A protein has these predicted regions:
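A short glycine-rich, Lys/Arg-flanked "PGG" loop and its adjoining helix->strand segment in the class I
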Residues: 107-122
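Short hydrophobic/aromatic beta-strand or adjacent loop that forms the aromatic wall/cage
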Residues: 177-182
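Low-complexity, polybasic segments enriched for Lys interleaved with small residues
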Residues: 265-266, 270
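Conserved S-adenosyl-L-methionine
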Residues: 164-175
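A short SAM/SAH-binding and catalytic strip from SAM-dependent methyltransferases
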Residues: 92-104
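Short alpha-helix
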Residues: 147-162
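Conserved N-terminal segment of class I S-adenosyl-L-methionine
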Residues: 1-89, 93, 110, 148, ...
Length: 298
């Protein structure tokens, strides 16, 4: 299993009430199955531990890779292209690590994934950014089968167009690390027509973080350096870059319902930056990761 994938999984592991609320897990582009096996064998932190026994689906179009997925009774192997409907159920959590970049039409793929999820289900994406600046030089890499370059801003656009809640969301893109990690909920807003949907339309839909809205209304487009999002470790992060003198937007403190503790208190925390310097500020620190959990399934 990739180290960064395990790190994200272990961060999710800390949220017991959220894990209790899940029943069906779908891994889109599962490869040889390390990640879906983690889900299939996950146990509670009780003493003694109790298996969650999630209903797991491993989706991949490569039969050779699927053959390496462990034969566990709660993993159903599905040899299908994830660009079409792949599973006969609605997911409570959809996991897509290192896979979306292989879609030739990622906007349509995200729409198809949305259709296979319950409202308030979570989509967890980890996807590499194949261009950027390193050592003061622009670089670009193109791998076989990858026709699109993803950025944090383009992902927010694609996800919100497809009805994913990018207001009550979690994102991390670290400096000098190509991986973009984002966890979003499926909202009750239907996917929109990507050809005609503007940023202003998405503002009206209520699916955007306040720092995203501020950037769009100030410049007419979204600037990466303006974005501030929490991550699963309960810290708040700028995306990839932050200037030496940082002012935290007052609007970053918004009264959302996306955390377990709905009675959040303003707490002192450290805003993570690309460089070792940090800024002490008072902002609303995420207490939990998830919305109040759904009732347990029978």
């Amino acid at each position: 299993m990739a180290r960064h994938a395990l790190k994200v999984l272990n961060q999710l592991r800390e949220y017991d009430s959220f894990l209790d609320s899940l029943k069906t897990i779908v891994d889109m582009g599962c490869g040889t199955g390390e990640d879906i096996t983690w889900w299939a064998t996950l146990e509670t932190r009780d003493d003694p531990p109790v298996p969650y026994n999630y209903n797991c689906f491993a989706v991949d179009r490569d039969p050779a890779k699927l053959a390496q997925v462990p034969d566990l009774k709660n993993i159903q192997k599905t040899e299908k292209d994830f660009n079409i409907r792949s599973v006969p159920v609605q997911a409570d959590l959809m996991w897509a690590h290192d896979s979306l970049q292989y879609s030739t039409n990622p906007i349509e793929t995200l729409k198809v994934w949305n259709e296979q999820m319950n409202v308030d289900a979570m989509l967890v994406l980890s996807i590499p950014q194949h261009s950027g600046v390193a050592d003061n030089r622009y670089y670009s890499r193109t791998h076989s089968g990858c026709f699109h370059n993803f950025t944090p801003t383009s992902l927010i656009y694609m996800l919100a167009v497809n009805g994913f809640d990018c207001k009550d969301a979690y994102m991390l893109k670290e400096f000098n690390d190509p991986w973009i990690h984002i966890a979003v909920y499926k909202s009750d807003v239907a996917p929109k027509d990507a050809d005609t949907t503007s940023w202003l339309d998405l503002i009206d839909s209520g699916l955007l973080n306040q720092t995203v809205i501020n950037s769009i209304t100030s410049y007419g487009y979204l600037r990466q350096e303006d974005i501030l999002y929490p991550w699963l470790d309960k810290e708040n992060y700028f995306i990839d870059y932050v200037s030496q003198q940082t002012v935290i937007p007052a609007e970053a403190v918004h009264n959302d319902t996306g955390v377990v503790n709905t009675k959040k208190q303003a707490k002192k925390t450290t805003v993570k930056q690309a460089k070792p310097t940090s800024v002490e500020t008072t902002i609303a620190k995420p207490i939990g990761v998830m919305r109040p959990p759904k009732k347990k399934y029978d």
